[in-house]
C-alpha cells in the first residue's frame, strides 16, 4: 500500500514538472530574453529524471522484478530515457536544440502512461515464465534506450527537413522577386539582400547543428538497438530454443535496424548527408512507432505480453 501510494505520488509529480517545463519552453520560444526561465526548465527536467528514477525503483521493490514487463512500465522507462538523454549533454551548454525534442517527448510518454487508457495495467503483476530471466534487464532496457535515442535523432532530422524546405522555398521566391525589384528599388535592394543573407547564414548554421546532433544521437541509439537485438536473440534461444522466430515484434525491430543502418551508410557519402540522410531518418521515425505501438495493438506473437489491455485488442 505504501509503495503504491508513493508510486502514484511520484508519477504525478514527474508529469506535473514536465508539464511546467514544456510551458516554460513555449514562453522562452516566444520571448528569447527570459534566460532565467530557460535555466529553470533545465533544472525541472533534472528533477523529473530523479522523480521517474524513484518511481522505477519503487515499482522494482514492490513487484520484485525490474519494471520492464509490460507497456506501462516500458513507457515510464522510455520517459526516463528521454530525461536521461536530456541531462547528459546538459553540461555542454549547447543543447538547446536537443532539449526542444527531449522535453516534449518526455511529456508525451509520461502523459500517455499516466492516462486512463492504461489504467488496467498500472498495477504490477507476477512475471510470466518467459520473462523470468536475467536477460530481461539487458534486452528490454537496451531496446527502450535505443528507441528513445533514435526517436530524438529522427525528430531532429524532421526539423532539419522542415527548415531546409523553408530555406529553399524562400531562396526561390527571393531569386524571382529580386529580378523584378532590382528595376524599381535601387539601393533598397542591397539592404534587403544583406538582411536576407544574414538570416540565411543563421539558418545554415542551424541546419548544420541539427545534422550534427541527429547523427550523434542516432548513432548512439543504433548501438543500443543492436545490443538489444543481439541480447534478445540469445534470450530467445534460451527460452524458445531458437535465436530468431520472425515474430511481429522481431520483424519490425529488424526493419527498424535496417532503416537506420541505411541512414548511417548514407552518412559515409558526403553527397548524401544533410537532407538526403534526414529523409531516411524521418522514415525511421514512423517505423519505430509501428514497432513499439503498432505491433502492440495486434496483441499477437511471442511478445503479446507487452500489448495493450484486452479491451483494446
UniProtKB/Swiss-Prot annotation:
GO biological process, one term: cytochrome complex assembly
Keywords: Chloroplast, Cytochrome c-type biogenesis, Membrane, Plastid, Thylakoid, Transmembrane, Transmembrane helix
Localization, UniProt: Plastid, Chloroplast thylakoid membrane
GO molecular function, one term: heme binding
Chain segments annotated as transmembrane: 9-29, 44-64, 71-91, 111-131, 143-163, 217-237, 244-264, 278-298
Coiled-coil stretches noted in the UniProt entry, renumbered to this chain: none
Family statement drawn from the similarity comment of this UniProt entry: Belongs to the CcmF/CycK/Ccl1/NrfE/CcsA family.
Function, as annotated: Required during biogenesis of c-type cytochromes (cytochrome c6 and cytochrome f) at the step of heme attachment.
PANTHER family: CYTOCHROME B_B6 PROTEIN-RELATED (PTHR30071:SF1), HEME EXPORTER PROTEIN C (PTHR30071)
Record note on quaternary structure: May interact with Ccs1.
Protein's name according to its UniProt entry: Cytochrome c biogenesis protein CcsA
Source organism of this protein record: Nicotiana sylvestris
Gene encoding the protein: ccsA
